[in-house]
Structures are given as C-alpha cells and as structure tokens.
C-alpha cells in the first residue's frame, strides 16, 4: 500500500449499497484505515454537491461531483466547468420537443420544469423526490453543471442535437 497515494470512490453502488441505502461499518472502517495510512480518499460521483451524503466518522479529502465538472476540497473549488448557456437553452428546448421534463443543477440548487416517472425513478436512487421548481427559469439561466433527463437511449440523438458543450453520462 505504500505506493498508493490517493483512492477515489463512487457513492451509489460502491460506498452505499443500492438495496441497503447506507454505508456498512466495514466500508467505514476501511476508509478510515486508508486515511490512517496516509492515503487520500476522495468521492467521485455524478451527484450534485448538495446530494453527497455525509458519512459519520469519515473525512474525505476531495469531492469530484457532477461527473468531474465541479471539484472541491476543504479549501475551496479546485475545478469548475459549467455547461455553456446556449447548450442549456437548446437542451431544454430539445427535451420539450420530446415531451421530457428536465432538471438543471447549479452547485447549490437543483430544480425541474416538470415531473415524469423516469426522472422520478432516477431521483429515488439518491433518496430524492422530484418536484417541479418555481425557480426553474432562474436556475436554468446558470451557471448549470448538470442537466438530468429521464430519456431512453433511442432519444439521445434528438435530445443532444445541436449541443456541443455537453455530453450524456448515463449508467442507469
């Protein structure tokens, strides 16, 4: 273990079991042992900073959120890469043509312009409830780090038509 300097961990399905919805004691002890041996431990997730759970007794050295678009540690922001405003607007329009609501996320807030089962199911993975936001237009004006749309693969191409500053990151 002496050559290892840093370790990265996803949350959903890695640190937190999909069925149990919590971190096991064995996982917590392992993370603490890594830190005790001088190995930096970091979260690497598609989640927003506000939805990263706190794990009692575990202090992470850094957080890579929004699939790496917003990275920070205790001292502040390390990297901040937002989606270009014109791409946010275009993606929202494209989703509307497909009759799909979207959820936009800043580093501090998220909000949706509607509700549908696919998007609600995605939110449930992170123990969140999808609700339409009265602040959607303000949030969509940016800065936006992530846009979530509960769409099947066959809708990826029309959803992303004309988008140059963002790409789909999907696992579910």
Show the residue positions of the predicted features.
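Short, small/polar residue-rich loop motifs at catalytic or cofactor-binding pockets
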Residues: 1-4, 65
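A short acidic/small-residue loop/turn micro-motif
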Residues: 23-25
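Short, flexible loop segments at the rims of nucleotide/cofactor-binding pockets, characterized by
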Residues: 18-21, 41-42, 80-81, 124-126
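Asp-based phosphoryl-transfer active-site loop
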Residues: 3-20, 45
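Active-site phosphate-binding/coordination module
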Residues: 27-119
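Short, basic/glycine-rich phosphate-binding loops at helix/coil junctions
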Residues: 9-10, 70-73, 138-140
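Conserved acidic, metal-coordinating active-site core of Asp-based
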Residues: 98-100, 105-172
């Amino acid at each position: 273990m002496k050559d290892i300097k840093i370790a990265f961990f996803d949350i959903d399905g890695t640190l937190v079991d999909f069925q149990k919805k919590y971190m096991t004691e064995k996982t917590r002890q392992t993370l603490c042992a890594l830190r005790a041996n001088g190995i930096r431990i970091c979260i690497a997730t598609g989640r927003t900073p506000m939805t990263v759970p706190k794990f009692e007794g575990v202090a992470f050295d850094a957080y890579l959120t929004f699939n790496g678009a917003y990275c920070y540690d205790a001292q502040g922001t390390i990297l901040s890469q937002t989606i270009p405003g014109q791409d946010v607007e275009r993606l929202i329009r494209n989703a509307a043509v497909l009759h799909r609501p979207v959820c936009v996320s800043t580093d501090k807030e998220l909000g949706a312009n509607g509700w549908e089962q696919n998007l609600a199911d995605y939110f449930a993975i992170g123990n969140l409830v999808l609700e339409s936001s009265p602040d959607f237009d303000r949030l969509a004006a940016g800065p936006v780090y992530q846009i979530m749309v509960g769409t099947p693969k066959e809708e990826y191409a029309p959803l992303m038509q004309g988008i140059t500053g963002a790409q789909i990151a999907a696992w579910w």
